[in-house]
């Protein structure tokens, strides 16, 4: 992957995948709910300041510094991305962006996590939280066929149920795991050690399992809105 493709995948695509699941679980429905601080457009926007700070800081404080290359160029590109995301006339639904999130996370976000750990010797706080949010997003126990004939995991957030769309093996893995246990440590271990997801055993990455399990426990006990508000302080 060349520099410019890496820049796009890690910053533009990675910004979406690392941020939208936490924002969705906290009640947001559109990208503009995250990036716009005031109501804009035709009424779809419900501003979430915590989700906005989470997405902004994960881009500029964790993703950009993790990428090898000219940091000034990367920051400029990131600012262009941030400006583009704020376009109120091009709304993107978070539930649609969430399609196949496990594979997307592996491609777009995991390299930033691992590079950050390699460079700094510690798990990046917000990216670590984003893995926990990914796991929390797949919280259902029942797979059903939706109105379009697609298999989906019926998951829940405070606002109600939603259809989680992914490949059947991913849905079956989470449905079985959630039936088996609610223990954040066990769930984090099972997900991170799934080589089919990550092409490696992420429990072997120093500090990652403990960090993700801790964030997941916070999400479970406090709810995403409070956990997100606390992580961005």
Map each language-model feature to its residues.
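Non-transmembrane, aqueous-exposed alpha-helical and coiled segments at domain scale
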Residues: 1-233
């Amino acid at each position: 992957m060349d520099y410019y493709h890496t820049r796009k995948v890690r910053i533009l695509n990675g910004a979406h995948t690392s941020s939208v699941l936490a924002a969705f679980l906290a009640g947001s429905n559109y990208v503009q709910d995250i990036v716009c601080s005031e109501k804009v457009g035709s009424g779809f926007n419900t501003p979430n300041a915590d989700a906005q700070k989470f997405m902004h800081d994960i881009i500029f404080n964790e993703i950009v510094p993790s990428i090898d290359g000219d940091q000034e160029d990367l920051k400029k590109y990131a600012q262009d991305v941030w400006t583009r995301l704020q376009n109120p006339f091009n709304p993107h639904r978070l539930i649609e962006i969430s399609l196949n999130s496990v594979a997307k996370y592996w491609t777009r976000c995991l390299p930033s996590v691992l590079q950050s750990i390699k460079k700094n010797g510690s798990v990046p706080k917000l990216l670590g939280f984003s893995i926990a949010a990914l796991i929390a997003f797949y919280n259902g126990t029942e797979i059903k066929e939706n109105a379009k004939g697609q298999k989906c995991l019926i998951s829940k957030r405070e606002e109600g149920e939603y259809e989680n769309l992914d490949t059947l093996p991913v849905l079956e893995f989470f449905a079985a795991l959630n039936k088996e246990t609610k223990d954040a440590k066990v769930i984090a271990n099972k997900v991170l050690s799934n080589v089919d997801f990550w092409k490696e055993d992420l429990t072997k990455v120093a500090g990652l399992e403990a960090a993700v399990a801790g964030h997941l426990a916070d999400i479970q006990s406090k709810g995403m809105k409070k956990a997100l508000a606390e992580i961005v302080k």
